[in-house]
Amino acid sequence: MFKKSSSRRRELLLNIAVAMSALGAIYAVSNRIIKHNGALLNLPPRVEAVADWETYGLEGHRMGPSNALVTIVNFSDFTCPFCQTQAPVLRTVRRQFAGQVAVVFRHQPSQRNEVGRQAAIAVECAARAEAFEPYHDLLFRHMDSLGTKSWTSIAHEAGVADTTAFRTCMGDPTIRDAVDRDVAAASELGAVVTPTLLINNIKALGYTDLDSLSMFVRAALESRSVSQ
């Protein structure tokens, strides 16, 4: 009798332990999902209006028509996962509003992360070889290996023919100055997080999903049509 009772007790304790372990695993996974999706996909960006917005699109790398009705200035960091996720959203919006939207990429590398700064310098050097966009895409694709993968090998992959000139460019102080100007502009704008988007006069702090960004673009287009 005692043996049966003891056996049942051990079985019950084992079942409780297994159940608690399973619940703990479910909680851990769901908590990661909530944190990831909540921060990255579901929470809306903080939005503010900017008076002198047009000046922020005068520098940087423009992807789209020069006469676009809507300019999205993207302050970004190649070591930022949220920026990595923002990039295809911006590409989709350019396709959706073809001829009406241009994206201007500007740098905002973390001051504590030298890899991000080196990535910014590298893509500036790729831009000298007319390879900004492919290099930009490859940096985000290879984010996990940035700092270990050679900047020159990425340049070769991006189609930069003269890799010797590319390596020389990496030490050019004028390239560093260009990155510094972007960082200063981001600070002036109050871009306290990456990415920060400026959709004409609307500043969106943080990742902006496709639906929200499309809404901002439509509002900007309507504002343009009313003012004309």
Question: Where are the regions a protein language model picked out?
Answer:
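Cysteine-centric redox/oxidoreductase cores and disulfide-bonded domains
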Residues: 7-11, 28, 35-36, 109-228
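Extracytoplasmic thiol/disulfide redox context detector
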Residues: 2-112, 171, 177-193, 219-228
